[in-house]
């Protein structure tokens, strides 16, 4: 197991952790059925923007 040679400063530690923040997924609303969906995904009603992509269940 590795053993550190010198103690890392708070600044160096925080710079390393600067990219670790979590972000929430953004939701958009379907223009046809009004349900919430993930952006750039086909809605459960079968619409992707203005295009009908698949048949609804």
Swiss-Prot record:
Gene Ontology molecular function: structural constituent of ribosome
Positions in coiled-coil regions: none
GO cellular component terms attached to this protein's record: cytosolic large ribosomal subunit
Pfam families: Ribosomal_L32p
Basic residues compositional bias, start-end: 7-18
GO BP terms in the entry: translation
Source species, domain of life: Bacteria
Region span, Disordered: 1-20
InterPro entries, per database record: Ribosomal_bL32, Ribosomal_bL32_bact, Ribosomal_zn-bd
Keywords, sorted A to Z: Ribonucleoprotein, Ribosomal protein
Family: Belongs to the bacterial ribosomal protein bL32 family.
The name this protein goes by in its record: Large ribosomal subunit protein bL32
Organism: Mycoplasma genitalium (strain ATCC 33530 / DSM 19775 / NCTC 10195 / G37) (Mycoplasmoides genitalium)
The organism's taxonomic lineage, starting at the top: Bacteria, Bacillati, Mycoplasmatota, Mycoplasmoidales, Mycoplasmoidaceae
Gene behind this protein: rpmF
């Amino acid at each position: 197991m590795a053993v550190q040679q010198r103690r890392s400063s708070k600044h160096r530690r925080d710079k390393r952790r600067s990219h670790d923040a979590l972000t929430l997924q953004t939701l958009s609303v379907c223009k046809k059925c009004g349900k919430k969906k993930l952006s750039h995904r086909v809605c459960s009603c079968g619409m992707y923007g203005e295009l009908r992509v698949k048949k609804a269940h």
